[in-house]
């Protein structure tokens, strides 16, 4: 879960704002590749090249996927069901 204390978030805010600002200037066709590059580069820099750490990194990516779906996609889908009706 990405729930870190508010005080710990402050150290990331400025750099994240700058990164998001740069990504928002890209065309939709380029965002995915550049975001993939950024995340891959971060993971390669912080995790040593050992199976244990590769496994941890893949686990982090899986949890990011699940959290994004739970917090963003699922509420969106729920609203669309209300708007258009269920299948």
Feature names for model-found ranges:
Residues 1-87:
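Solvent-exposed interaction surfaces and binding hotspots enriched for charged
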């Amino acid at each position: 879960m990405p729930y870190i204390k508010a005080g710990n978030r402050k150290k990331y805010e400025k750099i994240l704002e700058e990164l998001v600002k740069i990504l928002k200037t890209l065309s939709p066709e380029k965002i995915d590749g550049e975001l993939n590059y950024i995340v891959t580069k971060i993971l390669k820099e912080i995790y040593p090249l050992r199976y244990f750490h590769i496994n941890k990194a893949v686990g982090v990516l899986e949890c990011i996927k699940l959290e994004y779906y739970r917090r963003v996609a699922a509420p969106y889908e729920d609203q669309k069901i209300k708007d258009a009706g269920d299948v």
